[in-house]
Curated annotation (Swiss-Prot):
Example GO molecular function: toxin activity
Family label: Belongs to the neurotoxin 27 (Jztx-72) family. ICK-72 subfamily.
Disulfide bond entries: C40-C54, C40-C81, C53-C66, C84-C91
Listed name of the protein: U8-theraphotoxin-Hs1a
Organism: Cyriopagopus schmidti
Broad class of where this protein is predominantly found: secreted
Keywords: Disulfide bond, Ion channel impairing toxin, Knottin, Neurotoxin, Secreted, Signal, Toxin
Signal peptide: 1-18
Amino acid sequence: MKAILLLAIFSVLTVAICGVSQNYGNVRYNYTELPNGEYCYIPRRRCVTTEQCCKPYDTVNNFAACGMAWPEDKKRKVNECYICDNELTLCTR
C-alpha cells in the first residue's frame, strides 16, 4: 500500500513539473469560426493553407503559418499549423 501511495505521489509531481503534452507555449491564439463554417485549426493540426490556422491575439509580435513537419509516425512530412514569434523565430508546434 505504501508503494502504491509513493508511486501516485511521484506521478503527480512528475506531471506538475514536466507539464502536459498539449501545451502550445505561452502564445494565446484566437479560436474563431472561418467563412466556410468550420473553426480555425489549432497548432499541430494538419492544414492545407495558412488561412485555416488560428491567428494569435498579438499579431504584432506573432504570426500563424501552415508549414511542413514530421508527424509522430514519421512516415512522411505533412503540413501543420504553427504560431511563431517574429523576433525569436520560435514556433509552437
